[in-house]
């Protein structure tokens, strides 16, 4: 019966319930809560939690010190102490936040007051619009009839003049002169010639071929844009040696096909011609 009665109780035995009910009542009476009051309410809630925790600790200590009480585990008390310490730290942090907010609000109030003092008391009046009358079309003055003497004077004036014609001729002459000088300068400028360095392998028929005579035959080829370079004999095998000769050619004048064709004309000494290396200069 006692348990059923406590389930439907309409009074509070704990003080914090009464405090919460009283706080909600006054908040409803005073209207919406500002940001600063919310911070203070949060701090007060933490303070009430701390007080409640202390009250519970005191009750537990009082119950454990009684005659029939048994010694409980020490871990519960340590947890409560840790929670109290954390709540106190949070309380200090909230107090610091509240102080910072109060300082910021005071600074804003000071700045607002200075701005209000520096601003002009009267508003700038809008400029009055002036009534503009519609534009009237101005008629040009009537031309007077020109006298014969004035007509003669007008005829004597050369509006275009011969000076402008002379200036046009001078400008055309200068333009032609500059174009001619530019063309001469461009013609004198040396043009870049694309050249290539080629290393040829000239192979004889057998080891009895006179390699000196073969080199003489190859160097006897004279073409526009062809310059022969160094040469040497490279052994191939079985006593046979090939002629390795270097040359520089102009790409527009001498091609590799033409060079091979001219060398292979010496059929008695030359078996074949191969390009060992080809580099652009």
UniProtKB/Swiss-Prot annotation:
Modified residues (N6-succinyllysine): 117
Swiss-Prot/TrEMBL keywords: Acetylation, DNA-binding, Elongation factor, Nucleus, Phosphoprotein, Protein biosynthesis, Transcription, Transcription regulation
Biased composition (Polar residues): 115-132
Region (Catalytic (GEF)) residue spans: 173-281
GO aspect biological process, one term: translational elongation
Cleaved signal peptide residues: none
Modified positions (N-acetylalanine) in chain numbering: 2
Cellular component aspect of the GO annotation: cytoplasm; cytosol; endoplasmic reticulum; eukaryotic translation elongation factor 1 complex; glutamatergic synapse; nucleus; synapse
Entries under PANTHER family matching the protein: EF-HAND AND COILED-COIL DOMAIN-CONTAINING FAMILY MEMBER, ELONGATION FACTOR 1-DELTA
Name by which UniProt lists this protein: Elongation factor 1-delta
């Amino acid at each position: 019966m006692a348990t059923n009665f406590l389930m439907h109780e309409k009074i509070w035995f704990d003080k914090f319930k009464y405090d919460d009910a009283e706080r909600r009542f006054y908040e409803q009476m005073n209207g919406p809560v500002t940001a600063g009051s919310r911070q203070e309410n949060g701090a007060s809630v933490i303070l009430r939690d701390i007080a409640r925790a202390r009250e519970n600790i005191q009750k537990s200590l009082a119950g454990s010190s009684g005659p029939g009480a048994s010694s409980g585990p020490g871990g519960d008390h340590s947890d409560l102490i840790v929670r109290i310490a954390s709540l106190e730290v949070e309380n200090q942090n909230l107090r610091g936040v509240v102080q910072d907010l109060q300082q910021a609000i005071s600074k804003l109030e000071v700045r607002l007051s200075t701005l209000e003092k520096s601003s002009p008391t009267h508003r700038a009046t809008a400029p009055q619009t002036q009534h503009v009358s519609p534009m009237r079309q101005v008629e040009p003055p009537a031309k007077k009839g020109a006298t014969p003497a004035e007509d003669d004077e007008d005829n004597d004036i050369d509006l275009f003049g011969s000076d402008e014609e002379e200036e046009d001729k001078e400008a055309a002459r200068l333009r032609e002169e500059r174009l001619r000088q530019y063309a001469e300068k461009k013609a004198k400028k040396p043009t870049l010639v694309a050249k290539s360095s080629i290393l040829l392998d000239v192979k004889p028929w057998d080891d009895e071929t006179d390699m000196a005579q073969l080199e003489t035959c190859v160097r006897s080829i004279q073409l526009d844009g062809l310059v022969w370079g160094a040469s040497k004999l490279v052994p191939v095998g079985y006593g046979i040696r090939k002629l390795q000769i270097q040359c520089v050619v102009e790409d527009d004048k001498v091609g590799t096909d033409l060079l091979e064709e001219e060398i292979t004309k010496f059929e008695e000494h030359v078996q074949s011609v191969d390009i060992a290396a080809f580099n652009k200069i």
